[in-house]
């Protein structure tokens, strides 16, 4: 019933991580109102996990899109970066709102779960790319950063001393709903020890209206090892 939850919350833009090609094809069939950008991280085609970025067809026109790898050679498909255990990448889209005519830049990523340098250097590269590609448009960045809010990685992303910094939507939202964590490993971690590692960041004038971590389960079943993060922006 995961597609029912997606329909219920009705997000205009949706960032997904760890999506395999067969799952992507299943989701395309079940979510016909969305188009998607992204490639498999292992070959830049359909091998390995996608950091797929979905957007509502009725709401947005796709102006441009692309992918890069979080590595010393970001344009080389399947490249591993620094001390990373896995190939890591980001997929992005420049979207035009059919209602307002405004343009938005959206990016979705998934940082390494092992490599400390890979996370730190990966977010530095990401900030550079967002600055380069967004063209001053309002920015929405979604992803599993495998790093807690107090970590050097997230502090680097949100460092106001860096003109390329992003703002954590949770920190500026007037409404914050749900737990202070997002990763529960299918309920195997005591809730008081669960970390917040999934984020929505904004930049360039976006106002955050509400933020929530959707931690409900389907009976005793978890839909994922992470709880979705939902943010409303204006």
Please place each PLM-identified region on the residue numbering.
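Short, solvent-exposed aromatic-acidic interface loops
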Residues: 66-74, 110-113, 173-174, 213-219
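Residues that flank catalytic or metal-binding motifs in active/ligand-binding sites
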Residues: 32, 48-50, 87-91, 102, ...
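Extracellular/periplasmic catalytic domains that process cell-envelope and extracellular macromolecules
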Residues: 7-8, 29, 44-47, 83-87, ...
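Short histidine/acidic/glycine/proline-rich micro-motifs that form metal-
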Residues: 41-45, 112-114, 146-147
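Hydrophobic, aromatic-enriched interface-forming segments
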Residues: 109-113, 117-122, 126
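Active-site beta-strand/loop signature of hydrolases that rely on acidic residues for catalysis
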Residues: 2-27, 54, 93, 103-109, ...
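Metal-dependent phosphoester-hydrolase catalytic domains
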Residues: 117, 121, 130-139, 147-234
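Structured beta-strand-rich core segments of catalytic domains in phosphoester-bond hydrolases
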Residues: 13-103, 213
